[in-house]
């Protein structure tokens, strides 16, 4: 982890979002069910960018999908569908690794935490999909640029 890399990634990612929003192709895919295998592979490859600190996994996949001609709504939905297996696998792996260390009470607390976070995630994703059905990702792009620039000033200042 290097804060300068994170800061640069925020700025570069924000600029990439602005570029993709400005020059995106007219969407040819309006719903998730119509995303082709080829587009899904391209979106999955965009997800690899999230290995760079400061690059958002959802941001990379959403922008990758939009650049490949997917509507904002379908891109956002697909991005969050992609997250489900990754998050379940990571959670399962961590849980299996520490199952011997957790009491029954702690396991029930983990289950409650999982249920609450899943429910709140559904609410937030629904709100985001409602937002992107009416707006662009430009506000998110500017947020990334401003926040990244502030971090750059702090760490290089």
Regions found by a protein language model. Name each.
Residues 1-157:
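Multi-pass membrane proteins that catalyze or facilitate reactions on polyprenyl-/lipid-phosphate substrates
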